[in-house]
Amino acid sequence: MGPAPMVKPRRARRKSRRVWGASAAALVIAAGVTTLPTAPAQADNTISAADQPYFAYYHLDQARAKGYTGKGVTIAIVDGEVDTTAPELRESDIHDKSTCEVTSSASSKTHGTAVASILVSSVYGVAPESSLLTYQIPAPSRGDSASPSCAETQNGLSKVSVPWLLNQAMNDGAQIVNFSASSSLQGDELKWTVARALTKGVIITAAAGNEAMDENSSSLSQWSGVVGVSAIGVDGNRQDYSSWGQGVATTAVGGPVKTHDFATNQIVETSGTSFSSPIVAGVLALARQKWPNATANQLLQLLVKTGLNPDHTWNQYTGYGGIDPGAMLKTDPTTLPDVNPLADKGNGSSPTPDEVQQYADGVVNPLQIVNDNSYAYRGFDESLIADPMVTVPTHLGTSPRYHAK
């Protein structure tokens, strides 16, 4: 899968594959580039709920009628540019929080706008009243470019690297983060970013891929606690393009989805796990609204225990089965264990529970922490006090693990 977003036209999935810069090494810097103005979508170029099969499949009209809209929940996406002038998004609460200036291609804007619309469109979004924070990540192979300010790095990672953007979303208060792209990036910085999410109760959803193969090693879903999402059709069957792997936790409808193609100014039909992933993120937002006293761990327990596989058993193709919004909105998760059911995905998934506790206790080397405004070092390494590369507060010897009774 490589560092590619998962946009897959129905008849040319492999040919449409894009490569996203996920690390400083992959980022192409273009001097003097600024964000291009967004051209308004044509007023008559509209997409309705009836055009989106998933809307009827998940009975989202009934959810809205009962007041389940995701109101009060903040979702983030790390993706292409979102065109908020698209008719279906004009009433949505969307905020571009990109960390630097990125010029998006028509292809990237098509992808980002589609993902955002599935989440919060007032017309056919899963969680239409959630607030959406958007963070642009460039795809150089499609003509995206980033301003020189994006190259300012910490620990060798740019402001458009995956750890930086995920942490920025958490800095800005996101409760759920959707990542409809691939990332084979390893390293401590991403590990501690995921550990932060697990510690702070932020749920990350990630697309499994569209290459009809085991893509665990190139999906963010390989990481402990991340909700990997594969794709089914409205017949409930796994789609032939959908990838699989140890990180898959659930599955959702991946298409066909209608979206604006900004290269042709036409409405096109497409499919992919890029679109099943935000459906899951949106349903989790509905559950977060419905069950405000539940922890993130309990919401994930709810996801697992209401999965549509027989007896909620797990397999690498559909995880615990298709997501069931109706069951998630009827079943009180506060009675479920406050333990993340995805914390150990087997095969040595990372971060381990011990590593998550290291982060929570503040004993992780701060030189491995990137763009995290919540972390403070509380270990005993005095050399870190004077280290100019340390950007987080240091409070030596104050870790709770040293003072536990």
PLM segments and residue spans:
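Substrate-binding/access-modulating region of protease and related hydrolase catalytic domains
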Residues: 141-221, 268-271
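Secretory targeting and sorting signals
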Residues: 1-43
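Active-site-adjacent substrate-recognition loops and nearby beta-strands
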Residues: 60, 206-226, 230-247, 258-271, ...
